[in-house]
Amino acid sequence: MAEPDLTGQLEKMQRDWDERARENARFYVNTERQDWTDAEFFQSGERTVEEEILTDMINICQGKDPKRMTVLEIGCGAGRVTRALAQVFGRVYGVDISGEMVRQAKAAVADLPHVRIFQNNGKDLDVLGPIRFDFVFSSIVFQHIPSREVIESYIREVHRRLRRGRLFKFQVQGGSLDNSPEDTWLGVTFSEPDTQEMALRCGFEMRYSYGAGTQYYWLWFFRSKFPSRAWWLCEKYWLRAEYHRWRGRVSRALQRL
């Protein structure tokens, strides 16, 4: 169960983003302009995919046909990038903490049967059930989250859902800001050591990064193709304990003969 202060923070994030979505969802998703037309708004999502996805398909696909890949977008907002992802990948899922953003995103992808949108609680992916992903993406989302705990919770969740060897590509705030835990617009900032340590704690290899010290600090977190040493040791000792437990049972059974 989440701590009371974290629960309150998540509730505030949801309220604030619902309010922003009702006021002007497209502006708060992409602040380049306030009066987006449908065409312009979704074209801006296509540009994001061209810049951050299509130029990086070797890392993202690793030889797999993108039309056979299942991908997740964290913080899908009103569906700006989600629609563009659906042009590239076979199955696309999106999650967002705001119910109002989710409503608008569902309307935006209503004509795309291979896309599904869910409202989550802002810290985990339980709403998705047992689905595993070939690629996970998040852009201009974590820069708004005021809690390292929430961001790290998401990263651990992605590790749990991402197939071995696969990529979680995402952006965080790398600039120096005086953010407040109550501020759901200017989120927590990360340095290079912060992100390297976070990758290790969450079971990832941070293979590349770009934009450290800026608002657009991009990170390439790869899940290991092999179980970590810690996982291997746990399994080793579990198997040893199981062996001794069953050997004891067999020994007692033989004594009763």
Language model regions located:
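A short glycine-rich, Lys/Arg-flanked "PGG" loop and its adjoining helix->strand segment in the class I
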Residues: E152-R164
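Class I (Rossmann-like) S-adenosyl-L-methionine-dependent methyltransferase catalytic domain
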Residues: A2-F89, Y93-D126, R148-V150, L167-L257
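Catalytic P-loop NTPase motifs of RecA-like helicase/translocase cores
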Residues: I145
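Short catalytic micro-motifs in class I SAM-dependent methyltransferases
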Residues: I140-V141
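A conserved beta-strand element that flanks and buttresses the S-adenosyl-L-methionine
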Residues: F137
